[in-house]
Amino acid sequence: MERVRGACQSPILILLAIVLPFPSTSGPAIHPLIESLAARIRQRRAQLPELSPFALDSVMESISGQLDGEELLISNELHRCRGLRKLHLEIARLGGGLQVLHCVFFPDPRFDLPIFGADIVASPAGISAAIVDLSPVGLTMPVALLHGLESLPIPAFQQVRELPAWGSIFSPFVQFIRPASSEEESWFVDLADGYLKALISSVIDATPDASDAASTIQRHKSQLSYCIQQKRNDKTRGVLEKAFNPQWADRYIEEILFEDPPPL
């Protein structure tokens, strides 16, 4: 197994969410891996209890801008459900080249549930990065969920990438790879699906703690730390500022990508 240096250095790696197809017909089709993972996420998302749309300003649903003379398109879907305060899926496309899928499910701090996150970075040359994880925000991973993850077979990916400097937010189950073939791309989708199934089972079975419980306060603090760490990705902010403006970039990062958990 080859370990590849360079962690999360794509200019828009952490643009997150799951999206509908872009209205623009210019440029190549969405990469098959992005399409496959997006479809699988939508399929699993529909199984969550009490799923409903997350309030979203219409101007943030489908966004376009210019970056270095190329059109930057971003499309977002946001939902919430019992146990998860925000489910965000996004696909971003820059001209006919770079494509990014990002998905993140943030738990309600009253529930002992982890954060689900997945990202794919694609270009005409192929997939440069694919990452999936369930990041705990409690002191430990819930036992049932831990057992579910431990039972999942981990594919023998040939190229495993190094985590970024702020990678302490991830769990021991994080998989950050560069798929070497279409077979490995299929393995990655199936692995992400396994993580989603384990999470959904936990969401269905979970019961909330009181808002003032020590466990809730601790999970709220940990989730806030997760969001702060993600906001430190200066490349994401730089790309958004260049394509739009600093004020818009701040709003997108704070309200869409890494919105802090509401006060308890």
Curated annotation (Swiss-Prot):
Domain of life according to the entry: Bacteria
Keyword check for Oxidoreductase: yes
Coiled coil regions, renumbered to chain: none
An individual GO BP term: phytochromobilin biosynthetic process
InterPro entries membership: Ferredoxin-dep_bilin_Rdtase (IPR009249), Ferredoxin_bilin_OxRdtase (IPR022870)
Keyword Chaperone in record: no
Enzymatic class: oxidoreductase
Reaction(s) this enzyme catalyzes, per UniProt: (2R,3Z)-phycocyanobilin + 4 oxidized [2Fe-2S]-[ferredoxin] = biliverdin IXalpha + 4 reduced [2Fe-2S]-[ferredoxin] + 4 H(+)
Record field: transmembrane: none
Keywords, comma-separated and alphabetical: Oxidoreductase
EC number(s) stated in the UniProt entry for this protein: 1.3.7.5
Family membership noted in the UniProt record: Belongs to the HY2 family.
Function: Catalyzes the four-electron reduction of biliverdin IX-alpha (2-electron reduction at both the A and D rings); the reaction proceeds via an isolatable 2-electron intermediate, 181,182-dihydrobiliverdin.
Name recorded for this polypeptide: Phycocyanobilin:ferredoxin oxidoreductase
Organism of origin: Prochlorococcus marinus (strain MIT 9303)
Gene name as annotated: pcyA
